[in-house]
């Protein structure tokens, strides 16, 4: 593994703190399941800094949320946040894509949307399976949580995460179609 740069470590720290603190707020939709706008942090930071940053922000941030909330650390859900962050960061590996430089195309946006949605589904199914197998949670409760969490995360990703990331990229474009009139 390559050494983590100071900039990347700082980004992971800031992203983890934001994700961890913002993860304390949400709107309940099922037992212990919330629509949490904090998921947008994983999208933005993953797209800005890549899959390793997304993974670590998800893992550290979710652990922070669970610790501060006092309900104990639910490792399946912590790992699922890491998976989501990792998949959101895969976009940064595409040649020509850069939120920082404002370079992207429709294919990049489609790629982010698809990898993000796939990542959410895989991560939430993993968390549910982990809760059933390792934590001994009842199957019927977990089905409701998995469905609720998947719907909630998809909504936050499509309504906040994706548009914010695209907006940042657009605002960082180095050129415009404006022309100076003489």
UniProtKB/Swiss-Prot annotation:
Q: How does it sit in the membrane?
A: Multi-pass membrane protein
Return the GO cellular component terms, semicolon-separated.
plasma membrane
The record lists the membrane-crossing segments as 9-29, 40-60, 71-91, 114-134, 142-162
Question: Where is the protein situated, by its record's location annotation?
Answer: Cell membrane
Swiss-Prot/TrEMBL keywords? Cell membrane, Membrane, Transmembrane, Transmembrane helix
Per its UniProt entry, which superkingdom is the organism in? Bacteria
Q: Which family does it belong to?
A: Belongs to the UPF0397 family.
From the Swiss-Prot or TrEMBL record, give the protein name.
UPF0397 protein BCE33L2384
Which species is this record about?
Answer: Bacillus cereus (strain ZK / E33L)
Its lineage reads: Bacteria, Bacillati, Bacillota, Bacilli, Bacillales
């Amino acid at each position: 593994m390559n050494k983590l740069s100071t900039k990347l470590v700082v980004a992971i720290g800031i992203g983890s703190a934001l994700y961890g603190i913002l993860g304390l707020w949400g709107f309940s939709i099922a037992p212990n399941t919330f629509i949490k706008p904090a998921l947008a942090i994983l999208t933005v930071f993953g797209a800005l800094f890549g899959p390793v940053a997304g993974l670590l922000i998800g893992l550290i941030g979710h652990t922070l949320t669970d610790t501060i909330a006092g309900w104990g650390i639910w490792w399946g859900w912590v790992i699922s946040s890491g998976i989501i962050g990792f998949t959101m960061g895969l976009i940064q590996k595409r040649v020509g894509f850069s939120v920082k430089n404002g370079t992207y195309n429709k294919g990049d946006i489609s790629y982010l949307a698809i990898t993000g949605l796939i990542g959410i589904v895989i991560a939430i199914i993993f968390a549910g399976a982990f809760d059933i197998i390792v934590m001994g949670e009842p199957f019927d409760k977990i089905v409701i949580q998995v469905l609720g969490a998947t719907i909630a995360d998809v909504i936050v990703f499509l309504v906040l995460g994706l548009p914010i990331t695209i907006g940042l990229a657009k605002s960082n474009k180095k050129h415009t179609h404006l022309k100076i009139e003489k």
